[in-house]
Amino acid sequence: MGHDHIMVSLAAAHYTNQGIKENKKLSANIVDEALLEKADRSGCISGSKADKSDLFEYTLDDAGVPMISQSPVTMVCSVEDIYKTTGFENFICTIDAAYAAEEVLTEEGKIDYRTLKPVLFEMPTYEYLKTGDVIGKCMSFGKEK
């Protein structure tokens, strides 16, 4: 994957996959600890059985892609390809636009992950992990001294 691409892997049975395939667009909304309860609730409800559009405040971009207003970082993406694996659809996406809350940006306008502390969902244990601690600089561990 290049720096301008992401992969979004969703269980093939998810209702939202239909809309993504129809529209060839999606938004990836980064979850932080403040947003976690609502995000978890969203995962507990099937969109085929209940309207989840009222779980989050959202805005639409120019192409009509919903973006969660409370998300500290949102990427609007176009689907380039779909790779199917057992039970999953993997959407290969180009990032068309990215939006970040000012409070998670450095003075240079880059995302500060120490401030953002995105939550990761770890699949085998079904646990949420908070990130954000710097443990070293890239290419600093393997250099000869």
PLM feature segments, named:
Residues 1-145:
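Basic, polyanion-binding surface patches
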